[in-house]
Amino acid sequence: MTRLTSRRVASHSSVALAVAAALSAAAHAAPAPALALSPAPGPMIAMSTLQEVIVTGKALQLKSLKQRSIYESAYGDKALDRQQLKSAGVVGGAAQALSFAPGVSVSGYGQTGGTKASISVNGLKQGWGGFSGGTIDDGSIAVSFDGIPMVNAATGLWETPEVPQTGILQGARVTYGPGDPEYRWYNNIGGSVNFVPVQPTANAGGSVALTYGSFATENAVVILQTGKIDGWETVFAGGGGRSDSFRTSPDGFNWPTRNFAGFFKTRKEFRNGDVSFGAYIGDGHGWRPTPIPLTPNALISANGQDANGNPLPGPLFSQQTTGFYSAINSSVWKKNDYNRTWLVYARQNIQLDKHVTLHNQLWFRQGNRLHVHYNNYVAGAGNLYEHNNPFSHMYGDKIWTDIYLPYNKIGVGGFFINTVYNSRNQFYSPNACVTLTNPVTYTAYGQNPTTLATGSTICGSAAVPNANYRSDYWHVTNLDAFFQDAITPIASLTITPGIRAVSFQTDYNPNGATEYPEAAALDAYCNTVGGSCAFSGHDQGKLGSVRTNYDKVEPSVSARWQPLHWLAIYGNWATAYRLPQVGGGGGLYQSTPAVGNILERSVEYQAGAKLFWPEIGAFSKVLINANYYHDHFSNQFIGVSSGNGNFLGLGTGDSVYHGVNLSAEANWRELKMFANLNEEKANFNQYDFQGTNYNGMPVPYVPKTTFNIGAYYHFHTWHGVVLKPRAWYQYVGTQHMFDNNLGAPSTQTMPAYGVLNLALAATVPGSWYGNAVKKVQFKVEVMNVTDKRYNIFEELSSGGLYNTAPSYVGYAMGLPGAPRAVYGTVAVKF
């Protein structure tokens, strides 16, 4: 078998970035035509404000966070500014911040940005925390950073620790549903999220923020603005932190985590546009505790089991016995979960004439995961260690143009994206050994055959795994071409029909036997000799190489009518496709043939109304949005795994998500207020797993209700000091669980919960410090003020994780939410 490497990806990405730099330099060096950046006169402006010509990247990014941009959208979008992001708490990451958009809920195992979490947007998921064995709709949300896609195009997944530091963000925009063709990527089944980092400014300055608090939490964020130097504006931003978990094992292990992020962007504006270059790295890693049984079980000891499955002496492990926030002893189970992503990109925006703008962006992304797992819960386990180190590389180019005409704004363009993903993973135990009774020969890549002599003893290792292993490659190419026309026949009405042609091309190549040739040979040997041969694992890439290609057309239409200056009524309909999730220990390509149409499909429509008053009486910045949505998600492929990581099978489904989102925000003098509400119902029209039909069952982990409300006030006190008290409350309603024993949804629900948070900040003017700085802020936050005990996630066990099957299955396990925590921050702006 040919050994596959990422060498060709690296060379292509280097070429792509070189081309980006050349295009940017050429655009900057070219003589600029005498064009004004102001909108063209005449009917273009008279008909609709949507005809405004926006050229610079800074304006495009920051405009997306403005209330007026939300008001002018024909979708139920939500923009979270810096103040709303702070609702996540000073050490909360991307997942926690997004939970303050309507219809968004989060489940995870930690309180900082360094731990993984799952995000649900109107019921559809993104991110992964290693929780339930059933991943119903994961990977259905597109995620981008500064407009650059972050999601692994092969697996569809994005890990929340890739954006662990919200302190370097300007805001985030959430789009519900696929959206118009111009703004889609390759997995916008359920919507998209764009994280907008701090942007370069014309004035020099910066800030430093230092935080310390509960669970030995430490965090620092630094932002530096160079101001305009030779026409270039540049920003450097970064942050890092560490924390112990709020869960502690009986043996005292505190499950620590760490994270950091760094961002650089430089931009130069010229007469007819701008050019920018950016780079980003996000990293989060830490020890991940297991779900804990809610009630005690005689088979589940905090010290594990002996080789015969008998519980070892020690306390029974459950929330009722070892403590609500307890974790399994690290001497029997622990896992370090590491995630990192790099982005490098270039962007050009050029106004070609008074009617046409050209946009281009090129990028390269690399993603790495590393799971180092120790599992001695059952003494002498053959899979004592796991070393899971997959990686992905992506490069792409998106080019498009906006054409502004008297009654139309036309968008036309497309993108090319190439991704390589490797699923490398090894399970092994150095205590699992085999002594050969006859010789075994294997051939490593690029080497002569090697023979292991009779009598040789070989033990498991990361290089020669004795348990399951894999190293499979997916080469995925995504192509997109789109056309949309925002037609404005009268000033108050805009209708935007669109069409998008998409292509998903996949080359799959199993590479386990090439990556681990000695293990493959010993696997074959053990199959021959039989008995309790130690090398009983198998290459999880069971099927051969295959190439698939799927081409689809995605029609859409959106409409917005503004009968009054403060009222807009909107609606939209769209079809979108995506590749199903792949890359674990089985499923499509690896153990299930990828035949027929495997593309997952979404057909969604929305209808709603928005009210917007920049000023009305004593109120300002009033924005209210009411939205109904209905999403039919079909041709679903649902991988089901046991609690100890074994792939059990592939389910198929067809489901409907529908509900209502309400959001409101307003200022009343110095009082700032926001509130968000979601009511949703999601059910399977059809769900089949291993020959059993579960039609009509609820889709797991879709809260019936989510609600949040918050407010803060500016008190101007003595000598320029400003006090800002803040309060916010978050409620998550009941949600159905997944039954890992059945591999199917359950009618059982986990309880609702609500959490209250408070903060107080005092901002001292720079005059107190001789104007050496602009201002200094002192802040105290109290998260979960009432110390509410609740589980943020629950599942029904198959008995695999704690080796209780078949005697004891179907019991509930949970991940507790964080208890009360107090954080103090000192921030200096200069």
Language model regions located:
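A beta-strand signature from Gram-negative outer-membrane beta-barrel systems
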Residues: 150-156, 162-207
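C-terminal beta-signal and adjacent terminal beta-strands/loops
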Residues: 2-4, 730-738, 762-830
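Gram-negative outer-membrane beta-barrel transporters
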Residues: 491, 495, 617-634, 650-740, ...
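Transmembrane beta-barrel wall of Gram-negative outer-membrane proteins
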Residues: 205-207, 211-242, 247-304, 309, ...
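Extracytoplasmic beta-strand/coil segments of soluble accessory domains associated
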Residues: 62, 74, 93-149
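Membrane-embedded beta-barrel scaffold of Gram-negative outer-membrane proteins
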Residues: 351, 357-363, 369-373, 562, ...
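Structural signature of Gram-negative outer-membrane beta-barrels, strongest in the C-terminal barrel
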Residues: 407-409, 415-417, 470-631, 712, ...
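N-terminal periplasmic "start-of-domain" segments of outer-membrane beta-barrel proteins
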Residues: 51-89, 115-118, 174
